[in-house]
Amino acid sequence: MPDYRSKTSTHGRNMAGARALWRATGMKTEDFGKPIIAVANSFTQFVPGHVHLKDMGQLVAGVIEEAGGIAKEFNTIAVDDGIAMGHDGMLYSLPSRDLIADSVEYMCNAHCADALVCISNCDKITPGMMMAAMRLNIPTIFVTGGPMESGKTVLGGMEIKLDLVDAMVMAADDHCSDSDINDVEVSACPTCGSCSGMFTANSMNCLAEALGIALPGNGTTLATHADRRHLFEEAGRRIVELAKLYYEKDDEGVLPRSIATVEAFENAMALDVAMGGSTNTVLHLLAIAREAEVNFTMADMDRISRNVPCLVKVAPNSKDYHMEDVHRAGGIMRILGELDRGELLNRDVKTVHASTMAAAIDLWDITRTDDEAVKTFYRAAPGNVRTTEAFSQNKRWKTLDDDDANGCIRSVEHAYTKEGGLAVLYGNIALDGCIVKTAGVDEEIFKFSGPARIYESQDAAVAAILGDEVKSGDVVLIRYEGPKGGPGMQEMLYPTSYLKSKGLGKECALLTDGRFSGGTSGLSIGHCSPEAAEGGNIGLVEEGDLIKIDIPNRTISVDLTDEELAERRQAMVAKGKAAWKPAEPRTRKVSAALRAYAAMTTSAAFGAVRNVEQIEH
């Protein structure tokens, strides 16, 4: 039976100094021997998805102490990708994920924490904390801040739902009036919470349910709704139970690596493609699996994406639905239930709240359960009042959306497409693969060919699009924006949004070794690996080369022979130190912190995780 980790600093004569310091934090003699639970919060006033988390750590801490534990809260950084978007601030977003993972590891190991509650919400914070949880492998529960309510405004005499992507697209559309743009801007993000569509933050918070490390409703219960308080409280109660099961009952089944097995990662990816999640989830799942020491690769993702249908289309893949609508339709447990009915789910994996995923679905799937409390829970509705306060309203829909043919969540029989909402493409331009969110692509352009328009920075591409240099039929190719080349693998939400602004959203493709925001839709193909800065063939493409994209057959290629590519490679290598770099110097400032990330990071095909062996040797 394992000792409590905290015993290292709370027991023994030689720890008198440490105990003296523990006492200075408020601990008493009778507290030594209780499980010390770390509460990793991520409150910040910079990020709407985190602005309401200030008191959440102490809410959880109070419940932990009532349940017999000792809670110690600390904070991590949190970058808002939307605010950092479109300028050099985006260079810091992906690297922040690894810093967050490190900070949680540092705090928990330095202070010998016995268990962990992760309070996260937005794009890099949830995956960063997940990486830390797998790395630490101590009992852990995730409880996130919850999604924002969708924006609503009246345009042209009609009320419409909207989000921040609508504001970006309209701002660059010369046909939109200043008045309409202002109406959308002030209405797009009405409350605290993670942006209201199936963007990266909400995708990851939903995947936490599928991985089994968060409670039902975590991914879809609105940040403003009173029901969300119960998730925080239950997380506090349950983490003490998990800690005691492990340290006092020797139950290793409650540990993150026992829960997040390869079968659980398969479930998470099945959910991801079924709900048309953000392409960033691919990066993060690969990184989290690596920390969990699970062999889960792009090949596994490709296999799952071919077998699992797309059951959900939420903004940005649809104008009809946002996260509040997914919740009304039964949330993630309903989607997992539909996958289970289609025999597309591993039912026997463990969770932090139920013995198996099958047991959880039987209780929480609104189409199976007779529990009125569960059905009431999923009728939680938006309050439609501008606020930054959590738990500020308790509105309910009169009915649930259980229409499996035309509702927000469809059955396998009524799927939008037979294959999932994410796809991995391979070819001579992406030997290690690249990612496209098919749920956001019009099926008419699943096959697309066009001349490459080469840009060696996001800024250059944006200028060309806004300057009307990009024409219908073009393939906008943005390179040297990968994990090493950026560095930091910028998101390309502005280029994709501006293509829509110019009426080219369905008439052009965009290919990059960078990545895309969860708010991106259209024929946007990212994570092209190997990246240009690592000698990938994307660095050999020249202006006007024909790019061929074939989503049904999962291929992407430049129309060059192997011999032609070899000749170009030889010419590139001959440039010496100038090889595999932008032809023209870029003005961006790359700090020492970013250079350190670039020196250690790996390909997007491996999650853009750091590999210290690259600098050790």
Curated annotation (Swiss-Prot):
Binds 1 [2Fe-2S] cluster per subunit. This cluster acts as a Lewis acid cofactor. One of its GO terms (biological process) is isoleucine biosynthetic process. The modification N6-carboxylysine is found at K124. The keyword Magnesium applies. GO terms for molecular function: 2 iron, 2 sulfur cluster binding; dihydroxy-acid dehydratase activity; magnesium ion binding. Pathway: Amino-acid biosynthesis; L-isoleucine biosynthesis; L-isoleucine from 2-oxobutanoate: step 3/4; Amino-acid biosynthesis; L-valine biosynthesis; L-valine from pyruvate: step 3/4. GO terms for cellular component: cytosol. Its EC number is 4.2.1.9. Keywords: 2Fe-2S, Amino-acid biosynthesis, Branched-chain amino acid biosynthesis, Iron, Iron-sulfur, Lyase, Magnesium, Metal-binding. It holds the Pfam family ILVD_EDD_N. PANTHER family: D-XYLONATE DEHYDRATASE, D-XYLONATE DEHYDRATASE YAGF-RELATED. Functions in the biosynthesis of branched-chain amino acids. Catalyzes the dehydration of (2R,3R)-2,3-dihydroxy-3-methylpentanoate (2,3-dihydroxy-3-methylvalerate) into 2-oxo-3-methylpentanoate (2-oxo-3-methylvalerate) and of (2R)-2,3-dihydroxy-3-methylbutanoate (2,3-dihydroxyisovalerate) into 2-oxo-3-methylbutanoate (2-oxoisovalerate), the penultimate precursor to L-isoleucine and L-valine, respectively. This is Dihydroxy-acid dehydratase.
